[in-house]
Amino acid sequence: MNALVRMAEIRKSIDQEIVLSLEQLVMQKHIPASVFSFLEELKENNNREWFQVNKERYHEQYHSVALFADTLLSEMKQCDNIETVSGKKSLFRIHKDVRFSKDKSPYKTNIGGAFTRATKELRGGYYFHIEPGNCFLGGGFWGPSPEDLKHIRLQIAADPEPLREILSSKEFISTFGKLEGEQLKTAPKGFDKDHPAIDLINFKQFLLVKNFTDKQAQSEKYLENVFATFQAMRPFFDYMSEILTTDLNGEPL
């Protein structure tokens, strides 16, 4: 009897390993239409009762996006040092934090994920957002610390040309259009309002954004387009990594 139980356990373990191996071989190059259908229905039925009834559907769609994220992560790790360990680990929870929100609906109506670059020398991060009518990719610095923000501004004030060169490049403009993010209406403390780079110094956030249609996200070329977009962020990330890890004389911090 014990031998039979042991054999059953071994077979179960082998089956699980086979499933994991097959999942690793799956290359999800797009976001299935079923993900959008589920999120549209969730938007119309954003309550716990509906979600409980449709929980299995949610897990199926979440798994589809996780497979896409796994495929994308595999591509990204060939050209950047990413510390995110798996596509599943990159995804954010669908449950909302409603403690400080007027909107008390319990669930997000999107599925998003982020890849974190490894080591303090590699700054910036990659974000992908799946939502009906609002798919986009993002990257950059959403909320730099006061110390980092001051250092960025000092570096830009000392020599704005490297950043201007990146922002005016054909690839940057064709991919992102312009640098996004909140800006001060007046010069930050300690900076001259007439500084020739005040348009850049006034930024509080430094964001790169590219929008996609639902149809584009469902296309087999979506993975290729996402990878190309993230690659186009690299000159900006390399610049920010350099100025955030060196002083005004170019010496390591």
Predicted regions mapped to residue ranges:
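Compact, glycine/acidic-enriched structural inserts
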Residues: 131-185
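Long, solvent-exposed, polar/charged low-complexity segments
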Residues: 22, 26-44, 48, 65-69, ...
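Hydrophobic/aromatic-rich structural module bridging two neighboring secondary-structure elements via a short loop
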Residues: 77-121
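Active-site acidic/histidine clusters and adjacent loop/turn architecture
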Residues: 40-94
